[in-house]
A protein has these predicted regions:
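Anionic-ligand binding patches
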Residues: 2-4, 11-195
Length: 195
């Protein structure tokens, strides 16, 4: 069975291949340079994931997966949310996004720094049938970065599952409890039933 993953992220492609196991051929945007990524202008992770998957499925005619994910901080009314990657501005890097997050949480006590990573994975069939799978992982935002592993907000996110920051966790530890792997595992189980 052929699967298209609407991403250029090789890490996501490797993760999907591992979750699916044998009998699946996985393609991504790098394999189809003529496909331009969909514009992510939805108002939720789910909307953005569906837009990306539907756009790519209409062009490839393959089973297509796309995800949208980010950090949701309760004390910030859900921000950065769908703007996680560009929280400090359109071309902001991880350092700038983390600095803005810490600045906004300066006066927020530890007990009120609850947060979660959220992922929506949209799966679109070759005929356009759409199913969405969601995953999340709970934690809190630390007062300073802790660890050098991962990317994005990982050094600031203290995982309730791991009892350490994602910045201290190995890739295998993080992937065992991450929002994306939880959502993607559900999507892979669904695909295996249809193989």
């Amino acid at each position: 069975m052929q699967i298209f993953l609407a991403t250029t992220n090789e890490g996501k492609v490797r993760e999907l291949k591992n979750l699916l196991g044998t009998g699946f051929e996985v393609f991504c945007l790098k394999d189809f340079p003529e496909i331009t990524p969909a514009v992510e202008d939805g108002s939720s992770f789910k909307e953005n994931a569906v837009k990306k998957a539907s756009h790519a499925a209409s062009l490839t005619k393959m089973w297509t997966l796309a995800d949208d994910s980010g950090l949701v901080v309760d004390a910030l009314s859900g921000a950065p949310g769908i703007y996680s990657a560009r929280f400090a501005g359109e071309n902001a890097d991880d350092k700038a996004n983390n600095a803005k997050l810490l600045n906004l949480l300066t006066d927020i006590p530890e007990a009120e720094r609850t947060a979660r990573f959220v992922s929506a994975v949209a799966l679109v069939s070759p005929t356009g049938e759409t199913t969405v799978f969601e995953g999340s992982c709970e934690g809190t935002i630390l007062f300073a970065a802790d660890g050098t592993e991962g990317f994005g907000y990982d050094p600031l996110f203290y995982s309730a599952d791991l009892h350490k920051s994602f910045g201290q966790a190995s890739a295998d530890e993080k992937n065992a409890v991450s929002h994306r792997s939880r959502a993607m595992s559900k999507a892979c189980a669904y695909l295996k039933e249809r193989k």
